Amino acid sequence: MSNRYSVYSSHSAAFSTGGRAPQAGGQVSTTTLLNALHAHYTTGQPYQLDAGTSLVVNTLLTATQSSPEGHTGPTIDHELAVRAWEHARRRAEDGCIVLCSAHHSAPSILEPFLAALPLSTPSIAFTALAALRPFLTAVTTFNPSYSLYSALSACYNLTLKGDITGLSLALSTSGINVRKGFLDIPSEPGYRAFDVFYYLLTSASTPAEREFLDLRDASSYALLRKSGTYTPPSYLPTADDAAAAEDFRSALKAIGIKGASQRGLLSVLAGLLKLGNAAGFLVDQEDLEEACEDVGGLLGIDPEVLLHKCSTDDREVLISGIYEALVDWVIGKANEAIASQLQASLDDSSRGSGQAAQWTDDDTVSITVVDLPRPALGKAVAMRGIFDDTLGINAEMKDDGVVVPPAGPAVLNDMTAAIAQVEVDLGITTGPTWREREYELDKKHEVLEKVGLEVEMDSFLRQILFTAESEGITLGKKGRFDLATTLGSSRVWHHISIHPTDDLPENLSPGVPTAAWSAGAVSRQLREWRLAEWANRRLKQIDFTADFDIEEFIGRYFRLGCGEGKDGVENWLVERGWINGDAVVGHQRIWVRENAWWEAETMLDLKPEEPPAASPFMYGGGMLDPGVPHYAVPPIAESTSLLGSRDNLLNRQSTLVPSVAGGAKSIAPSAPHTLHTGGDYGLGTKGDDKKYDSHPYYDDEGRYLGELDPEYADPKHIEKKEITLGRRIWTGFVWALTFWIPSFVLRFVGRMKRPDVRMAWREKLVLVFLILLFNAIVCFYIIAFGNLLCPNKDKVWNEKEVSYHQGNNDFYVSIHGKVYDISKFWKIQHSDTSIETTTSNMEPFMGENLDAYFPPPLTRLCGDFVTDESITLRNNDTNAVLYSNAKHSCGPLQQTDPNTALHKITWYEDVFLPKIDEYYKGSLVWKRSEVSKQADSSSRYWVIKDESIYDLTDYFYTLKQMNNIDSYNFLPSSITELFKNYPGTDVTDKWPNSENATKAQTCLDYVFYKGKVDFRDSARCQVNNYILLAFTCLICAVILVKFLAALQLGSKRRPAPQDKFVICLVPAYTEGEDSLRKGLDSLTALQYDNKRKLIYVICDGMIVGGGNDRPTPKIVLDILGVDPKIDPPALPFKSIGQGSDQLNYGKVYSGLYEYEGNVVPYIVVVKVGKESEQSKSKPGNRGKRDSQIQIMNFLNRVHHRAPMSPLELEIFHQINNVIGVDPELYEYCLMVDADTSVREDSLNRLVAACANDARIAGICGETSLQNEERSWWTMIQVYEYYISHHLSKAFESLFGSVTCLPGCFCMYRLRTADKGRPLIISDKVIKEYADNDVDTLHKKNLLSLGEDRYLTTLMTKHFPTMSYKFIPDAYASTAAPETFSVLLSQRRRWINSTVHNLVELAALKDLCGFCCFSMRFVVLVDLLGTIILPATCVYLGYLIYSVASGGPIPIISIAILAGVYGLQAIIFIVKRQWQHIGWMIIYICAYPIYSFVLPMYSFWKQDDFSWGNTRVVLGEKGNKRVVAVEDEPFDPRSIPLQRWDDYALANNLPGRRGDYNMSQEKFYGGQYGDMGMEMDDMHSQYSSVKPASTILTGFPGAGRNGSPYMPPQSPAPFGGNTPGNRHSHLSSFSRYTDMPLQPGHQSRNLSVGNLSQFQDPSNRHSVGLMQSTDNLLGVPRPNSRSPVGGYTSRPQSAFDFRGSGGPDEMAITDAIRSCLAEVDLDTVTKKQVRALVEQRLQATLTGDKRAFLDRQIDQELANM
């Protein structure tokens, strides 16, 4: 007996679907089947062949249609799925549904069929199949997604109630056909390898990933290029590898293959591709070694193993084995994900019911859905199960006495033949194919084990090869299912797919999906599968779908009246009327057809349930132990310890101070500090475990390298906005030019789903068209327009120009008014006499007029007038023939030698003229003035007729020499008289119109023609030159002025130390640790009073940059030495964004940073994002512009004393109370990129320049490269950086209008020096710069690409009377892009932002100057210069080609180029920057890249943005813009606002600036007396934890003369057993010192909390030298208000804020001696020494100490 059943189930469903009645009882033929199938096909219905078999007809087109029942997808039999499920749960019988394909073009129906099962299939299962499909399918000509596995199963485990408890996917033991899918794809078009390889190579791969995996074009891989097909079929309109690749990666991520696992998987796939290049016997040894080297790096294998231990066959076997192992591993991960989701759902359901799920193996059955894509295997399985009576259920029926009529011999022969083709897949071990398979498997195991043991231990490849180290290679054994065993142990249901035609999918008509029908094709499939015989056999005799033991049957149906024993069963069957084969009683079993079984089951379901009797067949389903009730564990209450919050503003609402929003209740989260709980610094765990989290998430350009989260289509609401007239005009213009491109083409072909993206593309297209048109116009005007005005000007030469061509390969001569290039002729031996053609013989004729050397025979060319061959003309010029042997006179009288060709009188016209015409270049021309001049001065008889020049000088000379003999006077007198009377003039009008004159014309043309009049001096030929000359002069003037502006010959000035307070803003994004450390160290080491500079770092989101192993904020905090245990609260603030993205959260850290003896306070703001962002890829990230806006907003509210957000209040508290400087004192903001290093004296120089000129609102210095020799791409940027500063910016600085203050190194004044009016922190600048509606192409380029340049533009717009300067003495260095891809990305941003910003600048009203002497003119010149860069490159290429092809040398163009680069060279030569000579040469070599490649790429990529989905522009019409906005808008109430004074009063904080009657703050004593207190007693309400790095490390005076007793300190960055290296909540409050601690107590990163005893502000002015130490820097706080507030003037940083008396006389003397010992006393001045001393002391001496300094300098000099 078979083991396909266990016992029957007593659990019945409340309903049943009931099967359809079988087909008519008549004989079934192929014709009837064909007709029935066609009818069902046209209606999209399945056809039930028998109770256990269904036929469906599907094509690629119908697989995407909706059926009449509303099902989307291919036609499938849902009832078959329900029947199989009902049988499994009611009969406790394992079932197997076999999905067969009768045609290789039939689409796969596995996923739709799984969805049709009446089971809650977990969604992750379909995701897993989506992840698995690319590994298993490939494009073929007959099927665009053909499965290349033998069998794939989805095995469900069910309870006896029919509920799912498990699901797993598995391949059969036959595995995958890797040879057909990868190793040996057909070498004909239309075939591809497995889809996964093309997904790997698609653009979905990030640049960093492509570089790491060395991914190339598909044609670079030997195994992929066999067919030459690399893209999906064109007949699939939605097929796109890039989109599919994104879905594929998302699916991998969903099933747990992400991070290191996904990188390992991709590395293996890339390695297999490269290993394919090493497969084959014709591979070159060098290519083989290179491929093995690459593969070794990707797979973690020693290349020598692949090269020497593996043969070619071994490498192919290795590819196949690794690929199958990889697929098995993916299936394993998929099954883990499915099991996890199922377990979670079971846990949820058990908790919801209060009862634990308790199932055993005996309580479950299985349904296995097996997909057999190969028609051969499906046919063999089906025919064997139906027609083979020797095994399976057929054999059971025969053994039980059921009459099973044998199949016909023809059918059996077909079955046997079908089985023989696939006997290996069916587990038949007797044939030769089985032995071959076993040999291949053994070989595969041998190779895999040989290579696998050489693989690195921790590599991904070893993980997939050795799934269990103790078991060795288990490929093909573990995780697979045996097809024969599954079929033999289950009740089998067949679902067969028919294809209606043999036509290829590309020939199907998409208009009518069901139109494809070929009776012949369908009939062939029916006959091959013997479906007519199948139906007749099953329907008439053995269509039984249920069978029972007799006792089992009685036990199940006794409630329906079934009697005991076999007789009782037979009687009951007769009573039911089941006598015509509906049920058959065998020897041991009862066999029941589907309709009879359903009838009995339905009656059983309707029968009232009776108390179950004790029966061996009944399960005690209700006897299970009751579940223990579960109680939800309440969440742990928030800590109220010292680290907990005490008074949270967000919870308190407006209890203390009325809310700005009118007392509206805040909707912000009540516990913002819960964000990023855990991990270092409270920023989450990303990057904390470096061993397992070393993957770079972002590269240097901020492009995401990891898996991308899917973009969810959130619900939106629609709003309308007004658009400007200019925008409406521009939109209309764009549509007028692009109307011919339908939107649906952009949507479906261009994959631009959103209207705003399509509109941006149209705008980009129009802009590119206009730019190209303008470039084309420029090129046309310069190159071609002159030729149109003056055609053939380059095809004429005068005598002087001909004489220039005297080279061996540039041999020009003129003969009888025509110019010839005989460079290819003169070297040939063209004389038939003894004269040899040598260089020395020919050189005298280069560039000469050879009229006299080729005299025309008069009798041939003037035959109407000369008949005597002896008549010849003599030359008036005696020097005309200097080499007589070169004269080519022809005729028997002239050449008596009959052997020479010149002997013939016809030589001139027959030989010479045809040959010389081959080298004709153009006409010889003469200026009219020259013709007239020679006629007057040289008595030359020549005239002009019809622009041609004829010369009779030799004619009259010969006539005179021959005494006027009539035979020599052969020309008509009417013509000769004109030459005598009007020499040198135009005689066209006087020319006789006679017959003789007409005859004489031929003679004149051949004998007396001298050329044409030079037309190049005419107005139409000269006007274009003069216009170009005018533009040239204008450009040269601009270049000259720029040169003079840059030519600063003065010595470098050394300004006195400045005392202004400066914020050094450092926005950090994805920079590496080395760059960040270098940048922070450079700011710390600036030669500027450390107390008056603040390093303000803003980390833009939790992002891991390329090459980093931790998020950027954690790297910054690591460098600054912040204690990782610090976890400040996440506080809300308003960011730049759309909708709810405007709400952001940030954390604030503060402290002191020490470097080389300089101790500088810092503030770090980390943008961490909302709670809902934490699962996204870049939580908190809003861009650099948002970082700048954050500090600008903060300083604006400080200036206006306006209400602040919680984050700004915390920043104010940290700066004001912890660091000890009133934020209102800061006057400048130095903006420095995180990877930029600033030279020590740069800040002082910038501040000094601003102090000397109060009109300066912004200033920048020179930026050079740190990595100039790193690669070719950095080398070509060195000179560009240098000259752009010293030429362009220096020139613009003359006008006080530098158009771009680079964000990497510039400084802005915060407010005016006179009246304190806000500048960069003004409302109008912030409002425009913080624009959220960045929804047009122009705004995107301004605000998303060029925010730094646009900020300068806004400053120029709103403060046109202020100056924006460049000073070359301030110097910084930054890292330039080192690869071409990064350079492309950077220049795309720069060039496009430059163009759009210059357009904005050109429209400003108040630019200085007028006409051509205005800044507007310079801006327009720069704009045009940027736009026509490609035209410039094309023109230079044209010049090079023109000169190389023998054209005239463009003297003016060369002079301009020489002038441009010569003047530039003077600049760096004067500055003694000799190295720039080499850099200039490299730059010139790269000019095509800068002037053509980069601009053209940039112009076309103007719309290349990340378009957010929170604000989608749906369209523009009229003066309205329709915008879809997220349903979750930004509510300002989510960010409560409060004034600092109100906040400080409510929290008992010092530093209030108003006249509040503040209560005396509490004092706390301790073991350190009144010098120490708990930090928790002195924090803002947000700093509910101990402030980051704000614990003091010493008592007052803890510098050189500090107290010997030191309290506990914050941990030093490198730990150790140094004193103070333990954590404490106690701090001692001392005055700030910028000197390092004593040895033994020194820490690189000091703490800041120099808090003091609190004093009432009204008494602070009386403190004197013993002033309050309630702040870090000891800055006295005036109690007066600023002009904005209403009392006295704003506190200025010119006051002496040092508090103590400063350095004593001994320190001053020591500094003087040190400085004098280091300087050249012969050249140094007293003023310079004084400046050096003050710089060394880090203090500005005034009063008595200044006088002491002067006296002591004199005394020390006297003593030397």
Swiss-Prot record:
It is found in: Cell membrane. GO terms for biological process: chitin biosynthetic process; fungal-type cell wall organization. Its EC number is 2.4.1.16. GO terms for molecular function: ATP binding; chitin synthase activity; cytoskeletal motor activity. Disruption phenotype: Displays morphological abnormalities such as ballooning cells, intrahyphal hyphae and conidial scars. Leads to sensitivity to the chitin-binding reagent Calcofluor white (CFW). The chain crosses the membrane at residues 729-749, 765-785, 1027-1047, 1417-1437, 1449-1469, 1477-1497. It is a multi-pass membrane protein. Pfam families: Chitin_synth_2, Cyt-b5, DEK_C, Myosin_head. Glycans are attached at residues 157, 876, 996, 1392, 1557, 1645, 1650. The keyword rRNA-binding does not apply. GO terms for cellular component: cell septum; myosin complex; plasma membrane. Induction: Expressed during exponential growth. Residues 1702-1758 form the DEK-C domain. It catalyses: [(1->4)-N-acetyl-beta-D-glucosaminyl](n) + UDP-N-acetyl-alpha-D-glucosamine = [(1->4)-N-acetyl-beta-D-glucosaminyl](n+1) + UDP + H(+). Polymerizes chitin, a structural polymer of the cell wall and septum, by transferring the sugar moiety of UDP-GlcNAc to the non-reducing end of the growing chitin polymer. Plays an important role in cell-wall formation during both hyphal growth and conidiation. PANTHER family: CHITIN SYNTHASE (PTHR22914:SF13). This is Chitin synthase A. The lineage of its organism: Eukaryota, Fungi, Dikarya, Ascomycota, Pezizomycotina.
